[in-house]
Amino acid sequence: MNRRSALQACLAAGASFVASPALGKIAASDTTHELITSTITIDMHSHIPPDATVAAFPIKAGMKQAGLDAICASFPVDVVPRQAEGDWYKVYLDWVQQLKKLAKDSGIREIKSLADLESCHRDRIPGVLQATEGAHFLEGRLERLATAYDGGLRHLQLAHSVQDPISPTGDLQTLTPQFDGLTSFGRSVIAECNRLGIVTDLAHSSGKTLKDALEVSSVPIIFSHTALLSPVGLGAVPTWADNRLPMRLLRPDEAQAIAAAGGVIGVWHIFPTVSAYAAAILDLVNTVGEDHVGIGSDTGIAGAIYNANHRWPGQHNGFLHAVVGELRKQKCPPATIRKVIGQNYCRILRAVEQARDASHAART
C-alpha cells in the first residue's frame, strides 16, 4: 500500500468511524456527561513515573475522575543519565514491567489494539496504551522495536529533549540542527513502526524532521503535545524558566501539513486556565479542522505532580469534564468535541492497524 492509498483509506475509515456504534453515537442530550460517557476518550500523552504504585499513583480512580477511558502512558528514558551501552534499554524494560504491574494491581487493562480500547469504553474499565517518549532505548538496534511491540508498545515518540548520542532520529525543536532533518535511522524507525503497527509521534521533533517524516510515513502521524504558534498558543505558561516556548509550538504551515497527511495534533496542559486551554484547542481546530486535533495533556493522571484533575485554579471537576464543559461554553459543536476527545486518535490507531495488516498480507 503506497502513501496516497493509505491516506485515502484512513480518511474513508474516519468517515465511517464516527457512526460506528462501538464508538458512541450522538447522545440524545449533548451534556458534558453525555458527551464524555458516550465517546471513547483518550489522552494522547500522559506520564506514569517509573516507581508508580497503586498507593502513590491511584491511576484507576484518577482516570475515572478525569472521564478518560484510556491514556497513552509514557516515560522519557533520557531523563536518566546513560553511563554505558544498554542503560537506556534497561530503564525502558524496567518501566514497562512497572507499568504492567501497576495496571494489574490497579484493576485496569493494557490496550494493544483499537478493539481493546473499544472494550475499555464498553465495559467502563480504564486502560493504558503503552507509549514511550523518545526512541533512545533502541540505542541504534532497530530489532528492539519488534521486541518492544511484542511487549505491548503501540505508540512511539521519536525524540525528547535530550539528543540521542547513539542513534539520533533527527533534529529537535529546541536544539541547534545537526542532521538537516530526519536521519537515516529515523527513517528506518518510522518504516518499522508502519510495518509493525505502532503509532508514530513527532512531538519534540523539528519542523524539518517533521516534514521529512511526513514524506516517509505511509500512515498519518501524530504530534502529541503542543499548541499553535499564535497569540493564543503564546498565552501558555511553561513549566520551564527559559524562552523555549515559541520553539515548542507548531507554525500554522507545519500544523496544516500534519492535517493534510491525515494526522492529529494534541494540545498540552500548560495554559493558565481551563478557558485558555479550550481556546488553544479551538485555535487549532480553526486552523487545521476538527478531524486533526486531540488531547495530549502532558500531565499525570494521578499523584502529586502535574495531576490533570487538579491542573487549573478553581477546577472542581475531573480533567476532561472541565475541558469539555469549557468547550461547550465556548460554543464548540458536540460533534467536534467528540472528535477531539477521542475519535481522532482512534482513527489514527485504526489506520495504523490497517496499514500493518496490508503490509503483512503483501508479504504472504
PLM segments and residue spans:
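Short hydrophobic/aromatic-enriched beta-strand-loop microsegments
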Residues: 220-226
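Loop-centered beta-sheet repeat module
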Residues: 179-214
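N-terminal hydrophobic targeting/anchoring segments and the immediately downstream early-domain regions
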Residues: 2-175, 229-364
